[in-house]
Amino acid sequence: MSNWQLPEGIDELTGDEAIAFEVTRRELLDLYQSWGYNIVVPPMIEYSDTLVLNSKSIDDKTFKFLDSASTRMLGVHSDITPQIARIDSKNAEPNGISRYCYINAILQTKADDFYASRSPIQAGAELYGYKGIDADIEVIVLMLSSLELLNITNITLSLGNTAIFNALCASANLEIKDVTVLRDIFRRKSVPDLESFLSKNKIKDADKFKSLISLDGNEEVLEKANGIFKSIPTIVDAINDLAKLNEFFKDQNIDVMFDLGEVKAYEYHDGVVFAAYSDKFSKAIAQGGRYDALSKSFDSNREATGFSFDLKFLIHQQENSINKSKVLNAPNIDNPDLNQFVNDLRSKGHVIKTDLNGLAEVDFIQENGKWRLKE
C-alpha cells in the first residue's frame, strides 16, 4: 500500500476545492451571524457518554477509546448536535432564546451511504428556547438561504413530523424493543418488513402503521392523514403544524412535499423534521428538525430545532470557479523599500510570493530608487 493512501471513507480538500471551502465557510458563518447566531467550536473529543446520550445510532458511529488520564471512555464527535445541547445547558439563560452556528469536521466509524465520507465537515445552525412553529420556519429559511449561497437551485423541501410515529407507538402501547424495530423499518421504508413484523406480533392499530409508512406526497396527504389519525389528538396537532409550514412556504414559492412516516436516523428528533433535495443530487443535501427532549440529558429543559449539512460533500460536487488573484513574484533581496511596497500590496489583497530560488520572472522593478510593478 502506498504511503499517501488514506483510509476508506476519509478524504481531503486541496487546490481550488480547498479555496472554495474556505471562502464558503466564511460566507456561511457571516450569514449565520447576520441572523444572530453565535459561532461555537465544540471540542473534537469528549466523554463518550455525553456524546452518545443513549442513542444507538450515534453510538454505532462514534470512535471510542480509553483515556489514560481519567480512565474514562472518550469519543470523537460524530454529530455536533449533542454537543450544542451540552453547551446550551451550561451557558444559556433558562428562559432565553439562544442561537448557535458551527462548521466543524466530524469523524464517523461508518458512512451514511456507500458514496459518503466518514469525515464530513458539518455545517449547521441551532435555535434553543422556543417551541413555536416560528422557530422551525426560521431555521428552515436559514437552511434554504445556505443552499442558495452555495448556488444550489431547484430545491424541494420535504416536511415530516416524528411526533406522528412516536404518538402512534404510544397509542399502541408498544414496548421499547418493538419501537426500535419499527423505527428501523420506517427508516428503510421497507413495506415487506413492516407487514412481516405486524403479522408476527399482535399490534394495536396495525392498519394505521401500514398507512403511515406510505403517507408521502403533496399537501393532499395531510387531509388523508387527518382522516386516518383523527382519534389521536397528538397526531392531529402534528399534522396541523405541518399544514402551517406548508402555507408559509407555499407563499414563498418553495416546492413542498411531505413524508409523514419520516423518523430520521437519530432517535433524538421528536417533532417537525425537514430535508432539502435538489434534482442535481440523489440524496438529501441538508436536513434537520426538532429535538425538544435532548437537553434533558444535561438536566435542562430547552426546546430546540436546527439543521446541518456536509459542506465538504457539497464543495466536492460543485463546479468551483474561484476568482483567484494573479500571483506576483518578488525578488529575493533584502531591501526595506521593496519590503514595504510588497507589504502594502499584500494588505490590499495582492498575492505575492518571494522568488527564493531565482528561477521565476519577477514582477517588480526599481526605477529612480522607487519600486513599482512591471507593466
Model-derived regions, located:
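Beta-rich nucleic-acid/ligand-interaction surfaces
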Residues: 42-59, 160-170, 263-271, 361-362
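Acidic, His- and aromatic-enriched active-site or binding-groove loops in soluble protein domains
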Residues: 61-69, 174-195
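Short, basic, helix/turn surface patches
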Residues: 64-76, 184-187, 286-289, 374-375
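Hydrophobic mid-domain F-helix/FG-region of cytochrome P450s
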Residues: 144-149, 163-173
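Short, surface-exposed recognition loops or helix-turn segments adjacent to catalytic cores
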Residues: 154-164, 182, 257-263
